[in-house]
């Protein structure tokens, strides 16, 4: 078997729009009257006509000029939904900590099952200072032991905040009702009203957004990437996808750029497959840096194999040539666990700053994805 597997964000498509949307989601959850409705120091913006300048300003404030994003990615957290979750739960933790100090030791508690619960929390938090991005980053650095990856980070945060917040902390978990609320808010921003309704079959809770689908930016001319796919197939390689995006968020831009028809959907693996496996097997969602999504891309999205993928017992043969084009540490680790070799791509969030990580891990790298042909010829 000869196969080249592509991550999407930071490899084929710019991550910038996803990071923009994640910042807008955090902003909306905290400050929109539809959610927490906390007072904002900045002028409010209208979702249906938000400007690029407003987006850039929002992202700078929320993600601390991307310092928080870099920390999360270094911890193997690639899903923007999970990045939003990490930020929001830590903001709530820090605000609850301030409340405890001011009230002489009284603890707050939160229950988040529906958007109205966020409004109640906003009323309770009113008047407390909003933590800055550097406060959130400092808390992560102090609360999360070095070496933890992915969901382990959230377990550490949950354990650490137990002394500050009273009651049930299940809302801190990934895929909790709170996670689902802000994930739908993210999808409303990214998809826009029409596509959101078409895919999810209900109105978004906070409507009026045109979406960012038409603003996706390929990391090389779309026609050049299409030519790369076709050249690889001409040279005997199968091509596949392994992404932390949900399926619909992969399919829409791929169809827009006429890439989709070059692939076999059976090996276009997404976070949706990890979700489906968790429903079938009853275990955790094995997104990156687990091997599961990469194994789906290698062997196919076959539910009969999900258990073997989850246990990492299904590996390529020794003479198979399996390469993963990825931009992050989680791609390096996940591809290795799945029995594939990683080719580093320097168009992700870290850019050329990722070179030391790739070199430390013994990973060959190229400037952009369209340069991989030369690297494959050398192998």
Question: Where do the PLM segments sit?
Answer:
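Short amphipathic alpha-helix with an adjacent loop that forms part of the alpha/beta core around
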Residues: 371-379
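Surface-exposed amphipathic alpha-helices with a cationic face
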Residues: 229-233, 298, 332-336
